[in-house]
């Protein structure tokens, strides 16, 4: 059971909340979180780098000069890897970098990473009604009242996000702020942020989605 204080829009403590998420054992926690992080970063690779071998480069079918008698080194093709414009030896080819991780392990890693950041977790009341219109300045001021240091990396987790939502429109222009929905939780964002701000409703949704 984890306890955390709840702050309002003005940054005042207005209550406490508790949540419970099953995490990995202490001796295996860092290992499973590391596996999930490596999987996420590896799966983000496009894997479409491609070079041409001497067989794929256009031209080079004719022997550039006769084998003997010219005084130059023998050559069989102008597309030899030794030549400028020739093929590439052992160059990259399109490949699949995807790593597999069981669903139970992925969820366990997410829960472990989330609970592991409890010291940097800031729980706030729902504040969408506080922004009557998109206003980045007001959201930046609220983050400062909640304890997010300017220029530090912050992760803001909402229960859901709409493109027309005032919170989304206010947050998208803040350089070091990442905005995600509760069902978009991922290990990289949890570990990368200096502070994690989560609304009370998003915290409930996280328990609902990831508790199993």
Curated annotation (Swiss-Prot):
**Database matches in SUPFAM superfamilies:** Ribosomal protein L4
- Highest taxon, organism lineage: Bacteria
Region spans: Disordered: 45-71
Q: Which residues form a coiled coil?
A: none
Its GO biological process terms? translation
* UniProt GO MF annotations: rRNA binding; structural constituent of ribosome
- Renumbered to this chain, the Basic residues biased-composition regions fall at 60-71
Keywords annotated in UniProt: Ribonucleoprotein, Ribosomal protein, RNA-binding, rRNA-binding
Q: InterPro entries attached here? A: Ribosomal_uL4 (IPR002136), Ribosomal_uL4-like (IPR013005), Ribosomal_uL4_dom_sf (IPR023574)
Its Gene Ontology cellular component terms are:
ribonucleoprotein complex; ribosome
The record's comment on protein family reads:
Belongs to the universal ribosomal protein uL4 family.
Q: What does this protein do?
A: One of the primary rRNA binding proteins, this protein initially binds near the 5'-end of the 23S rRNA. It is important during the early stages of 50S assembly. It makes multiple contacts with different domains of the 23S rRNA in the assembled 50S subunit and ribosome. Forms part of the polypeptide exit tunnel.
Outline the subunit composition: Part of the 50S ribosomal subunit.
The protein, known as: Large ribosomal subunit protein uL4
What lineage does UniProt assign to this protein's organism?
Answer: Bacteria, Bacillati, Cyanobacteriota, Cyanophyceae, Nostocales
